[in-house]
Amino acid sequence: MLLAIDNGNTNVKFALVNQAGAIVQRWRLATDIKRTADEYAVWLNQLLEMEGYTRADVDAVVIASVVPRAVHNLQELAAKYF
């Protein structure tokens, strides 16, 4: 599955997209440029597990952002945990 991350000024939105292109799960978190990759990972891992998924189910990550200062931590999240 694809993990799509949309980083906006107010919220960071996460969606799991299956092979058919359908969104099977979505979550939202308040944007905070101080939030670390590790913090994102703990939060996201818990939500994945609550819905019956694991990080191993994610084959790829795509990030869209209008908050340049927050991109680095999201890129680190993708590289380190997926």
What label would you give each PLM region?
Residues 40-56:
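A short, N-terminal amphipathic alpha-helix
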Residues 2-44:
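Short glycine-rich, Thr/Ser-proximal phosphate-binding strand/loop in the N-terminal lobe
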Residues 51-82:
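Short beta-strand-loop/turn "lid" adjacent to the catalytic site in phosphate-handling enzymes
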